[in-house]
Swiss-Prot record:
Other remarks in the entry: During catalysis, the active site Cys acts as a nucleophile attacking the alpha-carbonyl group of tRNA-bound glutamate with the formation of a thioester intermediate between enzyme and glutamate, and the concomitant release of tRNA(Glu). The thioester intermediate is finally reduced by direct hydride transfer from NADPH, to form the product GSA.
InterPro entries assigned to the protein according to its UniProt record, in alphabetical order: 4pyrrol_synth_GluRdtase, 4pyrrol_synth_GluRdtase_dimer, 4pyrrol_synth_GluRdtase_N, GluRdtase_CS, GluRdtase_N_sf, NAD(P)-bd_dom_sf, Shikm_DH/Glu-tRNA_Rdtase
Gene giving rise to this polypeptide: hemA
Active-site annotation: C46
Name by which UniProt lists this protein: Glutamyl-tRNA reductase
Domains as described in the record: Possesses an unusual extended V-shaped dimeric structure with each monomer consisting of three distinct domains arranged along a curved 'spinal' alpha-helix. The N-terminal catalytic domain specifically recognizes the glutamate moiety of the substrate. The second domain is the NADPH-binding domain, and the third C-terminal domain is responsible for dimerization.
Upper classification of the organism: Bacteria, Bacillati, Bacillota, Clostridia, Eubacteriales
Quaternary organization: Homodimer.
Species this protein is from: Clostridium botulinum (strain Alaska E43 / Type E3)
Length: 401
């Protein structure tokens, strides 16, 4: 069966950051999980940790193995949800369409689902059922995004913090990290009339990618030379530890906004004790009214039928897959009967031309009845009457051995 294991929706960030998955160990995790699961996809983003898998059954022993592989403390089990079969499938489709994002309808999740899918595909970590589920979900996500026209009002944590800081008259910025979120943050920042941006990175080659004169690319270790002169700092690294400590921020100076887009958090919570500093973590940011939330909800809600349609298509595929062995058996039987009949005719017929004509006639007749039987079998399967139909067709077409 298909199942998903993830972190419950309202789990505090203090717990979520202890249940993260290290990106640099993704392939290792897949390899270890496959010892216990038939197929697995790890969806790990800055604000989502979910494992989709195929398994015969789920028990506490299996859950403990999964916790052990990710080095999670099993005392956090109460913060984990597990959904199976149709509930798991529906959850994936809703995730892919943006219904479960902290920021409703945010535009990064579809790409993140695709990336996770291809990582498992390339690692040969998928069975057919899980592979087809994600193919349907990704196709659904594309259709949903296109038809609901969410691209007309794109939103992400990066766009929200940039707009919020611009509205608060910030002119001097520092961005920490240049992964997917960091790049997106820089894109939004540079679309505005700002004075300068300090981009703190560990990879010095990134400097060659930046052509905007407002950007100063600095070594990550140099960030504290400039951080106290900034109006706004946006941190989005993948570090497993704090990168902005309380002692890094001076007590005296102009007001400074600090947005922490990372999970685990980049920013020391105690910085909030400094009068001139305001720190917002990813949970705080999700509550900021970006002005378009109601519009996005209406667009998404009115197009939810797309999700239901693709889910039903997947369920149909799954039901029809259950009769695939019988269809194969029917084709083999049909060929055996055809071969016997044409061999008998050849032995009795004197003229080659008659054999060719008979060959075509017998083959077309055999194919017609076989294909018609398969069509009926599929129709009855989708109606839920496959067992009775299977019994009748078997008794007609497949002789007892």
């Amino acid at each position: 069966m298909i199942a998903v294991l993830g972190i419950k929706r309202n789990t505090p960030i203090e717990i979520r950051e202890k249940l993260t998955i290290k990106a640099n160990k993704h392939d290792e995790y897949l390899d270890r999980l496959l010892k216990y699961l038939d197929g697995v996809i790890i969806l790990a983003t800055c604000n989502r940790t979910e494992i989709y898998f195929n398994v015969s059954f789920i028990n506490e022993e299996l859950l403990k193995k999964i916790f052990e592989i990710f080095n999670w403390n099993y005392s956090y089990r109460k913060y984990i949800f597990i959904s199976e079969d149709k509930k798991a499938c529906k959850h994936l489709f809703e995730v892919t369409c943006g219904f479960h994002s902290k920021i409703l309808g945010e535009d990064q999740i579809l790409g993140q689902v695709k990336t996770s899918y291809f990582k498992s595909l390339n690692a040969k970590a998928l069975n057919l059922e899980l592979q087809r589920l994600f193919q349907y979900a990704i196709t659904c996500g594309k259709k949903f995004k296109s038809q609901s026209r969410l691209f007309e009002i794109p939103v992400s944590s990066a766009s929200i913090v940039v707009n919020e800081s611009i509205n608060k008259d910030c002119k001097k910025f520092m961005v920490l990290g240049y992964g997917d979120v960091g790049r997106l943050t820089m894109k939004y920042l540079l679309a505005h009339n700002i004075n300068e941006v300090y981009l703190a990175v560990r990879n010095k080659k990134i400097k060659d990618e930046i052509v905007d004169e407002r950007v100063n690319v600095i070594d990550f270790e140099e960030k504290n030379k400039y951080i106290n002169d900034m109006d706004c700092v946006i941190s989005c690294t993948s570090a497993p530890h704090i990168v902005i400590k309380k002692q890094d921020i001076n007590n005296i100076g102009d007001n400074i906004l600090i947005y922490d887009l990372a999970v685990p958090r980049d920013v020391d919570d105690e910085i909030n004790d400094i009068d001139r500093a305001q720190v917002y973590n990813i949970d705080n940011i999700s509550y900021i009214n970006d002005g378009n939330k109601k519009m996005r909800f209406d667009k998404m809600d009115s197009n939810k039928f797309i999700l239901e349609n693709y889910l039903n298509e997947y369920y149909e595929w799954k039901r029809l897959r259950s009769i695939a062995p019988f269809i194969e058996e029917l084709k083999v039987t049909s060929k055996e009967i055809y071969d016997k009949r044409i061999t008998t005719f050849k032995n009795k017929c004197k003229y080659r031309g008659d054999v060719d004509l008979a060959n075509k006639m017998i083959k077309s007749t055999s194919d017609y009845y076989m294909n018609r039987a398969i069509e009926i079998m599929k129709e009855e399967t989708l109606k839920g009457s496959e067992e009775e139909c299977l019994r009748i067709i078997k008794s007609i077409f497949i002789a007892k051995k």
